[in-house]
Amino acid sequence: MANYPDFGGLLTRLLDYRQTDIAWLASASGIPDSELRSMADGVPPSASQVDGLAAALGFHTADLFVIAGFPVPEALQPCEAAAGSGLVNLIHVVMALPADQRTHIHETVEHLPQLPRIRPADPPRAFYRGDGGLGAMLVTMLCANRNLQSPINAAKTLHLLTRGRMYLAATTYGHIAAGTVPLRPTWVGGFATALGIPAADLAAITGTDLSEVTPPEDPLAAEMAELLWDCRRLRASQIEHVCAEAEAMLVPVPDDASCDDWNRVHHQNGTWWGAPRRG
């Protein structure tokens, strides 16, 4: 990937930020110190080393493959690419639900069976794979690893999870992936929120200064980022089932209801449907 720093350099940035070193990483990952030092000097990691590093560093293995500049192994890819189209609506609805109902949705997702992966004859165009360096890394983790696939889905999801702080035109994600626009601190913070990666970690990896734009702590956004990740193992039909179950929890919003007390989701036949804000 053109303009992409070697993995050893990115790993060193992260370790420096965390104020730890190769000796600690060797102990935590089970990878010999000598191999890690070679990696830091520019030797690419093996697939098994990526697995060990992911566990030690607290990253999803699929994400660390992308950070390392490698294709994600098929076994770590989402179950069905077509499932991505239903994820935005699911996140939109579940964010509005009170905590107990959100917990039910999480449990529903957790207990759905793992079905065989589907490989369509005409897979979606992988616009996010390119030679855009760190921008391609961010967009690939969001669109491919979280199964959002399209830039429109990515734009809507980031808008939801950042509570409107970040809304980019869909075409901008293509520019980010291609490396034709520089990464902005607000963008890196927004990606961190949607990816469920600590913003400071992502800033260290990308070499971004977040001192003036540190994203606020948002437990609900972190919870939705986790849901987005968990849904990657589901087929489109399963996501439709979960979304229907979530929508069935919505109730008519009273006409005189305050926005401070109710979350509104969609308007149908003169009535707003949503949920009371109970936490």
Task: Report the location of each language-model feature.
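Residues in the helix-turn-helix
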Residues: 24, 35, 63, 172, ...
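A short, Lys/Arg-rich alpha-helix, primarily the initiator
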Residues: 1-21, 107, 114-157
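Residue-level signal for the short linker/turn that defines the boundary of a DNA-recognition helix
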Residues: 5, 9, 19-20, 45-48, ...
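Short alpha-helical "recognition helix" segments of helix-turn-helix
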Residues: 24-26, 53, 151-161, 191
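Interfacial/linker helices and their anchor residues that mediate assembly or domain coupling
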Residues: 73-130, 210-279
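DNA major-groove recognition helix of helix-turn-helix/homeodomain DNA-binding modules
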Residues: 49-63, 184-201
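Recognition helix of helix-turn-helix/homeodomain-like DNA-binding domains
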Residues: 30-45, 54, 69-70, 159-183, ...
